[in-house]
Amino acid sequence: MEIDLNADLGEGCGSDEALLDLVTSANIACGWHAGGAPAMRDCVRWAVEKGVSIGAHPSFHDPENFGRKEMDLPASEIYAGVLYQLGALSAIAQAEGGRIAHVKPHGALYNQAARDAEIADAVVSAIHDFDPSLAVFGLASSGFVDAARHAGLVAVEEVFADRGYRADGSLVPRSQPGALVDDEREMLARTLEMVRGQRVRAVTGEWVPLNAQTVCLHGDGPHALAFAKRIREALEAAGIDVHAPGALHAGERA
């Protein structure tokens, strides 16, 4: 049994370098919701040094709301925005001796792409047209994952250690009760169940089947680093191999 651990980096949380010792894939903010060129370069350099797979973390252009505000934009604008952000991170990665291996949308763009076919197609088209060898990280069992596979891209299904789920497999919105799981024991138990049992219990009590291929560890909580360490240890103690999906890694060139 195997699993990937990923974290969203370059968002100003201050623990990026330490998290890169624990995760196997890094989703690096591309400046539109957080971060910027210096942070992108730092994260890429650290990822290359530590052998962590590099991913782009594009979003809506919304630094005021950390990219978490839903937007109604033309598909052409979403396409162009994703393409722009991929190009920026790719240039930095190339200069640092690495390359992008995957793409994971951020925040509202991630959630809207999971349920809106037009947005999913716009994001997938941008990724495919930029580099069809890139893998796509998306919410497990979502329409975004289906769209990526339909376009011939490798899709990696993502689950969340610290987020509540609804019965349809979607995440509980952050504005609603049950959105965040902050009890460490519960997070560890849920993560092991998602990876080994391929299911998660919804906030309404039902078991929801899912295909867990990568687990997101958010790096912006007060205990995020300690929890990331414990979850890595728990997975390895359970005999689960932790590594990035596929053969693409940070230090490889195309």
From Swiss-Prot:
Its EC number is 3.5.2.9. Signal peptide: none annotated. GO terms for biological process: carbohydrate metabolic process. Pfam families: LamB_YcsF. InterPro entries: Glyco_hydro/deAcase_b/a-brl, LamB/YcsF/PxpA-like. Keywords: ATP-binding, Hydrolase, Nucleotide-binding. SUPFAM superfamilies: Glycoside hydrolase/deacetylase (SSF88713). One of its GO terms (molecular function) is ATP binding. It catalyses: 5-oxo-L-proline + ATP + 2 H2O = L-glutamate + ADP + phosphate + H(+). The keyword Calcium does not apply. CDD domains: LamB_YcsF_YbgL_like. It comes from the Bacteria. Gene3D superfamilies: Glycoside hydrolase/deacetylase. Forms a complex composed of PxpA, PxpB and PxpC. Belongs to the LamB/PxpA family. Catalyzes the cleavage of 5-oxoproline to form L-glutamate coupled to the hydrolysis of ATP to ADP and inorganic phosphate. This is 5-oxoprolinase subunit A. The gene is pxpA.
